[in-house]
Amino acid sequence: MDCLSQFRATLDNYRTHGWQLARVLMTTKTLEALRRETATDETRAKVDDGDAGLKFENVAARESELDAMWFRRASSGGREAWELRLAAEPYALFEMFEADEAEEDREDVRREMEARARMKNEG
């Protein structure tokens, strides 16, 4: 199964369980596949201007060392659950954020989770 198909299959599974796609991380190779898939005749004729504007399921795709997706959903007590899921294998990291937790603190935790996933992906 190609990587974009893996992304779609994983996304379908998470949506079934009430998760919302929040962020998309793609390797250069996967971004290129997405670019080819979404290109129109007009955009094929243009000079490549990077990955600005590339979207997967209406979510901006960011270049990364990982092929992964961030999912989120509401949880009890006003909390919010976030999960980072690798696209190609059944590996995910989960974090529950309190309602009053600062966005800066949440972002720090998400960066740490991405670093852990990169380590897993390399090993």
Question: What is each PLM-predicted segment?
Answer:
Residues D2-Y14:
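Phosphate-interacting basic helix/loop segments used at nucleotide- and nucleic-acid interfaces
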Residues Q6-A9, T30-A33, D108:
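Exposed alpha-helical structural elements
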Residues T16-G18, D48:
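A generic structural signal for short, solvent-exposed coil/turn residues
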Residues W19-R23:
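Short, surface-exposed beta-edge/turn micro-motifs
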Residues L25-K29:
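Structural motif
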Residues L34-G123:
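Detector for the mature cores of small, proteolytically processed
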